[in-house]
Each structure stands twice: as structure tokens, then as C-alpha cells.
Amino acid sequence: MAETTTAAAEEERNFVAHFKDQQILPPDEIQQNPRNEGLGASSRNLSVRDFELVRTLGTGTFARVWLVRLANPAEEDRDKVFALKVLRKVEVIKLKQVDHVNHERSVLSDVAGHPFITTLITSFSDHDSLYMLLDYCPGGEVFSYLRKAKRFDENTARFYAAEIVLILEFLHEREGVAYRDMKPENLLLDAEGHIKLVDFGFAKRLGNRETYTLCGTPEYLAPEVIQSKGHTTAVDWWALGILIYEFLTGYPPFWHSNPIEIYKQIVSKPVSFPAEPAISPAAKDIIRQFCTLDRSHRLGNISGGAARVKDHPFFQGVIWEDVYYRKYRGPIIPPLRYPGDAQNFDLYPDEKEGREPYTEELAAKYDDRFKGF
């Protein structure tokens, strides 16, 4: 027992140490740097009992994200807080999300250390649940700020779009990963107002292959996804076009209360712009080039890839190295009162009692498929 406790304490020290003098590494050094080597690896000796659950940050169909701190921290680590994503095995199985959950953990493990992607520090499991320990982004969702502001000015939209471009460049060109769920709800702000992309449940390694799964959020789906033609990383550039439109107007270009009607609009209607608010010609052009029905002509997916995106007039004057190294000041600085402040997140009801148990029969059938945790 003492040996297990010592091992758990060592794992705690390792992942806490990562944040003490975190530095931004060039993209080609992220995976090679010894400092990032252990990030995302499974921790066999960690338990949910090693953490104090402070409050819920978000919920999903089969997951709940908690704000947590170490249960027995060293004095210098008392202010350290994290986000703990808890996935109930029985719900993951019922909703046929086993592959998606494994993809999420695997992809996050490989991209840990990127300045604009949530950091998977470690993962672990117990009989009933899977756990992913992530860095805490205290600013909350970009979605919330957009709703309060009604819309963003062009400089704000450009700031967030530029950071997303660097995310997609890294995922697509270095990792061969399609993210497939770009939307304001999946963009969090850190304490300095920079983006962190979260929720990689639909992310998938494609390389140069196509995939045919219908997944994502209706308003942001590319036409080839809806038409089951097979899709690639090009779907993320389409979604970025939709996102920039929403940043500038306050709403997506395709909308209806019935998702089927949204799909019909996406595959048949070009993006149109309102008379008000005024949108610059450069912004309109980049949106149109991202939201091109034929992906072979879609900006980001054509020859030159992300480099062509960076050269677009919408990003004129942007120094991309300064974007990557976070030298630009965030346009929205989240209000924070103390370390671990969660005022920028909604309140959520407690978990319901009487959840369906993860039986020994289910464990015998499925536990091998969760061995990555």
C-alpha cells in the first residue's frame, strides 16, 4: 500500500511540475521535448480520490467535467487547479462512443503542449469510469462572450481566427487529424484571453484517407459530410468560415429549428451576408473561400494549405510567429478573482442518483477496449 501511495505522489508531482515553468515550444519540437514526453500518458496509480471535486464546469450526454484540486497538495501547489473529465463507461458503451472516446484520448496525448489546444496531462480509470485530467481554462466558452457582446468586431474575430488557423495547421499537416466539431462552445479562453480548443470526441486521424461518419454540429457541417461523399480535414476549414461569419454577425449563415432544413440550406445555398452589420470585403472573401461547396477549391484544402490561408488579405498585418508565441494581447480578458475562480462557467445540477451500474458482464466484454486509459 505504501508503495502505491508513493507512486501516486510521484505522478502528482510530475504533472504539477509541468505547469510551474511552462514554455511554448515550436510546433516541430512539441512531441520531441522531454518536458512533454509524459503528457497524456496513462497513470495507473492515480485515483479520483487523489482530487478534491470543487464544482461542475460542464456536462454532456455521457461525460461531466469537474474543476478539481489535489486532495493533499504540497504547500506550493495549493493554488493549482485542473479540469477532470469523467466519462461513465456504461453510458459510453450504450451510446456507441467507445471508439470516439479512445480517439479523443489518443489524439490529445499526441498534441499535448500546443499553446492553443487543451493539454491532456494524464488519464486513468476505475471500475465505473474513465478520467482525463486537463489544464483548467478559467475564461469559459467563447460562445458566452459572443452572446453577451451580440457580435465581435473584426479585430476580435481576426484574433481568434488566427489562433484557430494555427491549431488546424498543426492538426492537419503534422498530425493528419480532422477535428470535426469546430464551434464557439468548444473554444475556451485561458486567463490571458487566448483560445484553447477542447472536446476532441469527434477528432479522427485520417492522414490522406476519407471517412464517412456523420458527426458534428448541424450548423457547422460541411456539405460533403451531409451528402456522405466521404470527408477529409477540409471540413474544418469550412467550419472556420462558418465560425468567422458567426463572430461577425452573431449568428451562423445557415439556421433552422429543424436540422434537416439546415442540411438542405448548406448543400444548396451560397453564404449570403446581411446589410448590417457591415462586413469588410476581405472578411466576406475569406468566408466565401472557406465555405466553398467543392472542397477541391476550398481555401485551406487547396495547394499551399494553411500557408495560403495566412496570406489571405483578411490576415494582412498579422505576424504569425507572434500569434503562435502569444505576443498579442487577448481582446477579451476574462474576469478572475482568484486561482480556481469558476464564475465564467454556468452552474449545473448535481448528478442524478441511481445510475445504471457497470456490471461484471460489461466489464468482461469491454474493459479491454478501455485499456488505453
What do the predicted segments below correspond to?
Residues Y160-A161:
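Activation segment signature within eukaryotic-like protein kinase domains
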Residues S123:
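Activation-segment/catalytic-loop signature of the eukaryotic protein kinase fold
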Residues H127-E141, Y145:
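Conserved short submotifs of the Hanks-type protein kinase catalytic core
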Residues R64-K89:
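Glycine-rich ATP phosphate-binding loop
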Residues M1-V48:
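Intrinsically disordered, low-complexity regulatory segments that flank or precede the catalytic domain
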Residues V54-T61, V65:
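Protein kinase glycine-rich loop
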